């Protein structure tokens, strides 16, 4: 069995990690922290976990308690996660960080996009990006994994195959994406209160959302990214627009064939002609994609739907950990969504 620690287990991504660990045949949760909830039973905060973790109590972080664990997930704010990873390196087997602390390879981007100076830029080269569909081999045996942002997962799975195969012009790509409110985290905020989000649909982070440079880093495209908040709990739908590469004349069929071929052996990517829906991915680790070419306007359109807490965060983290540890990549993860 793989001994697992979840640092920051009291947040939504932490609770999702616990849910997935409960069904994982190789994971045994040995340690779960939640400093603001230290002393609180996990089942008290999240009754959905009562069947699997009736006696688990969130603890305050103690490096000695974490030492020797095979696998540690970090579900903390970026700067806290950065310092935690440094403290745990060499004391635990594999670290999977769900924050952005190690996602960007260029340390100069952190002050502009995240508002802090990266104090350990030497670790950015060591960290392996945790999106198996686009970099599986690098993950094998990795000891420090940076999992993608939720929007980045959806946009990158949609765009990267087309950029890599030379099907679209990488300049001037537009990504419009909408997310459920759980992406904002468990802490109460004025802009995520029920009365604020109910019956509302709003854009935010105009021209400066922090996932922009990450999408560009992963896809190799220049991106104008606009996120939106939708009054639902979970899910992301990304709609991406690009011009065809110079000298190419795509069709809807050729785009679907390209995506289908690129992801033919992927257990968690579904390519269909039908438009994807977030509800179809709910609770699963799947990404649902489709594509179109509009002859009238000359645009390529690619859509991707995921569950932001599953494939977009905790599910993707478990998938990356499975690859790093040499386990069955699909262990603990569902490829069928919940409906209705």
Residue positions per predicted region:
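Short glycine-rich or small-residue beta-strand-to-loop segments that form or flank ligand, phosphate
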Residues: 3-6, 146, 239-241, 302-305
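A short coil-to-beta-strand element that immediately follows conserved catalytic motifs
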Residues: 29, 170-175, 224, 268-272, ...
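Contiguous C-terminal substrate-recognition/catalytic subdomains in enzyme active sites
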Residues: 192-284
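N-terminal Rossmann-like NAD(P) cofactor-binding subdomain of oxidoreductases
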Residues: 1-204, 292-296, 339-340
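Alpha-helical scaffold segments in soluble metabolic enzymes
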Residues: 16, 20, 157, 161, ...
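Electropositive phosphate-/nucleotide-binding environments in soluble metabolic enzymes
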Residues: 11, 78, 125, 152-156, ...
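C-terminal active-site/capping subdomain that shapes the small-molecule cofactor and substrate pocket
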Residues: 241-340
